[in-house]
Amino acid sequence: MIKQRTPKKVIQATGVGLHSGEKVLLTLRPAPVNTGIVFRRVDLSPVVEIPASYEYVGDTMLCTTLHHGKVKIATVEHLLSALAGLGIDNAYIDVNAPEIPIMDGSAAPFVFLIQSAGIREQNAAKRYIRILKPIRVEENGKYVQFLPHKGYKITFTIGFEHPVFNDRPQTVSFDFSGTSYVKEVCRARTFGFLSDYEKLRECDLAKGGSLDNAIVVDDYRVLNEDGLRFESEFVTHKVLDAIGDLYLLGSSLIGAFEGYKSGHELNNRLLRELMIRQDAWEYTYFDTENYLPAVHPEYYPVEA
């Protein structure tokens, strides 16, 4: 049986909010079986809980933002990506601000945080969503789709007419039966164009944005002194984002996802379309009588 997982102990981290520029304290806590991932705004009285669910996504401009009434938590995708990548099913995430800290712009600091807390298996079967039929959402030449697949595979293409991108599309594909999220995906940082960053500053946004937490590109080159961490970092970050956005289904996936020049909005629309099409998916669990999905060994049993 593939079991549910939760952090072994409470652990904290501090960072800066990308848009507020203010210091944020994040606390990761273990949670009982079948809790799911739950964000908590502990700076409010009473504390407001927001489940990590596609139904609570209220804004997808620049990042994925969860809303519960007038309360929000922004930039959840990198942390969710790390939780998904390490197979964490249940956790409480306490924050004292309306956004998750941006850290270095990747999911690697969150992976380190979770690994530092330790991972504990729980006495309940992990739930998966298995894709049974193709589902596709498209708009203005961009698209996202789910396809049936025995394991979990993500393919993404970006395209920018810019010298840094060699004026042509970039594509990567990760099949997680043989790919390590920790080694090959989590270190990819978010990226943006200097011209857009300046416009955001004028709108009182991106106050916490810097070369320390994003790859910044001007009209010709990458401005970060150390350049890229690896050649496919731009498009791999889009895979990282997608993994986080897809985890808002509340379960790990058995299927293939393809994104073409898409972003958080299309990702969320795809989740909503999938849930409506109940003939296109099913919940499944894996025990000794059921076949195991093709997933990387880092998902398999850990020390209790």
UniProtKB/Swiss-Prot annotation:
UniProt superkingdom: Bacteria
Family: Belongs to the LpxC family.
Primary enzyme class: hydrolase
GO MF, one annotated term: UDP-3-O-acyl-N-acetylglucosamine deacetylase activity
Keyword Methyltransferase: no
The protein's Enzyme Commission number: 3.5.1.108
Cofactor: Zn(2+)
Organism of origin: Legionella pneumophila (strain Lens)
Pfam families: LpxC
List of residues binding Zn(2+): 78, 237, 241
Biological or metabolic pathway of the protein: Glycolipid biosynthesis; lipid IV(A) biosynthesis; lipid IV(A) from (3R)-3-hydroxytetradecanoyl-[acyl-carrier-protein] and UDP-N-acetyl-alpha-D-glucosamine: step 2/6
Keyword DNA damage belongs to the record: no
Gene3D superfamilies according to UniProt: lpxc deacetylase, domain 1, lpxc deacetylase, domain 2
One of the GO biological process terms: lipid A biosynthetic process
Active site residues of this protein: 264 (proton donor)
Function, as annotated: Catalyzes the hydrolysis of UDP-3-O-myristoyl-N-acetylglucosamine to form UDP-3-O-myristoylglucosamine and acetate, the committed step in lipid A biosynthesis.
HAMAP family, per the entry: LpxC
Gene Ontology cellular-component terms listed: membrane
The protein, known as: UDP-3-O-acyl-N-acetylglucosamine deacetylase
